[in-house]
Amino acid sequence: MAEGEDVGWWRSWLQQSYQAVKEKSTEALEFMKRDLTEFTQVVQHDTACTIAATASVVKEKLATEGSSGATEKVKKGLSDFLGVISDTFAPSPDKTIDCDVITLMGTPSGTAEPYDGTKARLYSLQSDPATYCNEPDGPPELFDAWLSEFCLEEKKGEISELLVGSPSIRALYTKMVPAAVSHSEFWHRYFYKVHQLEQEQARRDALKQRADQSISEEPGWEEEEEELEGIVPSPKEAKIPKETKTTTSPEDEPAPQSPCEETPVEPPAEATPSESSESISLVTQVANPAAAPEAPELPKDLSQKLFEASLEEQSLAEDEGETGPPPPPPSKPLTPAGRASGPEPRPPARVETLREEVPTDLRVFELNSDSGKSTPSNNGKKGSSTDISEDWEKDFDLDMTEEEVQMALSKVDASGELEDVEWEDWE
């Protein structure tokens, strides 16, 4: 029993192995058959194309050459044999090479040369009977315009070459002229078709050239962008121009002077009671802020000197009080009507406070002090000098007397004299 089981196992193993080998060998054979079939098809196709092209060339060559006698019979038999071969091995139309790409054409000289799409279209146009039988395509006006400029006599040499070199044109010419069309109509239609073909080819070349130019110009655009980027400064390199400051000429604005180079400011001349109302009116009009700019402030050094001069004057006044007669009592401040009141004693400390307020315009003091002395020459007139002076008195009603104004002006003169003495001592 054990031996029978071993034999059965060996049989089943052998059968499985044989079946696996058979399946693998079958697949390998199928692959080999498929490869051989593809190889034979490729070789057959290439051979058939070559034989057909060669047979066509030889046949056309034999047909163009004229001969007689026994040689003609031999050539005819050979031509028929080659025709049978070309018909047998010629591939089907769906397997032919596209004529727009490349076409093997047989020339009268017996050589095969590749034709481009233009030559292939020209060959098909020459061998098409519709080219010569039908009316030209397109508007008749265009054909008439072309015909008016076309001269058939100038094409005699080209016509002879076409009849000798192209068997298809020669055969069609022999059949159609003069049975179907006249000699002039035959060639007019042919050359007009060639003219249309040339125009179409020119349009294609122009489109192709434009496409090539657009492709070639793309890197140029990138180069121009790079050049522009090189010309335009980057944000880091770009610098903001500084704002130009308007400067005034030295004539308009005086240069700063040192304290030793400063000249004393002369006080404005005092207005005497004998001055006419016209002169006072002129001064008030000049001092009017609506007509003239504000008075410039006095420099700090001058105010300091005035303050020092006031201190010296105060000390001198104290000395005079001890030794000489006392200073005359200051009069009462001016009233709005411009009349001075009775005497009123003032402490000397008022002079110090007055000196600290010196940087105001002295012309205002002059106008206030002289406003009561001016005679109203323009009474009742709007905008007269007295009205202006009264307005100024209301606006700037300072608690000062004429004596104090005189003292302030004398202090300015004294400071100028002291400065001159200092200059002489320094020299």
Swiss-Prot record:
Residues where Phosphoserine is found:
92, 166, 384-385, 415
What UniProt keywords apply to this chain's record, in alphabetical order? Phosphoprotein
Residue ranges under compositional bias (Acidic residues)?
219-229, 388-397
Q: Indicate, by first and last residue, each region the UniProt record lists as having compositional bias (Low complexity).
A: 268-279
**Domain called BSD: residue spans:** 146-198
Composition bias (Polar residues) maps to: 368-387
Bias type Pro residues, positions = 324-333
Region of interest called Disordered, as start-end residue ranges on this chain = 208-397
Answer whether the UniProt record assigns the keyword Phosphoprotein to this protein: yes
List compositional bias (Basic and acidic residues) regions by residue number: 236-245, 347-364
Record-listed Phosphothreonine modification sites: 353
Q: Which PROSITE patterns match?
A: BSD
Indicate yes or no for the key word Lyase: no
Q: Record's InterPro entries?
A: BSD_dom, BSD_dom_sf, BSD_domain-containing
- The entry's protein name is BSD domain-containing protein 1
* Organism this protein belongs to: Mus musculus (Mouse)
Q: Which gene encodes it?
A: Bsdc1
